[in-house]
Amino acid sequence: MARSIKKGPFADKHLTKKVEDANKGNKKSVIKTWSRRSTILPDFVGHTFAVHNGRKFVPVFVTENMVGHKLGEFAPTRTFHGHSAEKKAAAAPAPAKK
């Protein structure tokens, strides 16, 4: 279920404070955060966030298209290594029908 419009978007206060400080000083340093749940606000555009994915920090450069999404959407937590080639090879040669 989506968040109520009257509540507005959620962004951690410490994160918005860091962005405001960076905007005041015209600094474009990487902002490290564990807050995957924070919504990307228009003030965040042009900044790079290091978003924690459970193991390491993934750099996320925010563009205008990302506004309204969550920071965690751009830092995947699971790695897909592909299906085993052994199963593919066994399933591929299907018997020919006559």
Curated annotation (Swiss-Prot):
GO cellular component: cytoplasm; small ribosomal subunit
Species, as recorded: Anaeromyxobacter sp. (strain K)
Gene name of the record: rpsS
Similarity comment text for this entry: Belongs to the universal ribosomal protein uS19 family.
MF annotations from Gene Ontology: rRNA binding; structural constituent of ribosome
GO BP terms in the entry: ribosomal small subunit assembly; translation
Protein keywords: Ribonucleoprotein, Ribosomal protein, RNA-binding, rRNA-binding
Alphabetized PROSITE patterns for the sequence: RIBOSOMAL_S19
InterPro entries: Ribosomal_uS19, Ribosomal_uS19_bac-type, Ribosomal_uS19_CS, Ribosomal_uS19_SF
HAMAP family, per the entry: Ribosomal_uS19
Biased composition regions of type Basic and acidic residues, renumbered to the chain: 9-24
Main function: Protein S19 forms a complex with S13 that binds strongly to the 16S ribosomal RNA.
Protein name: Small ribosomal subunit protein uS19
Region of interest: Disordered: 1-30, 78-98
